Amino acid sequence: MSNYTSLINLCSELNRTLGVTSDIERENLIQSYYNQGLISYRQYYLLIVSVRRHEYINNMFVSMYSENW
């Protein structure tokens, strides 16, 4: 799976669970993607910050921070 695809899937799941699942569970999901090498440390850090701020992650994030371009 490419970094772009991984990031899209992860962001979709994070947005879907916003306000439904605890922040700890959402952070664990990000951690699991990072541990599998599916996202970079920079992406990991930015997503953790977004989760802690309870932000919706839009497509611009994926465009700006994907490793594929």
Predicted features, each with a name:
Residues L18-S66:
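Acidic, low-complexity, intrinsically disordered interaction modules
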Residues S2, M64-W69:
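Short acidic DE-rich linear segments
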Residues S2-E25:
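N-terminal acidic leader/helix
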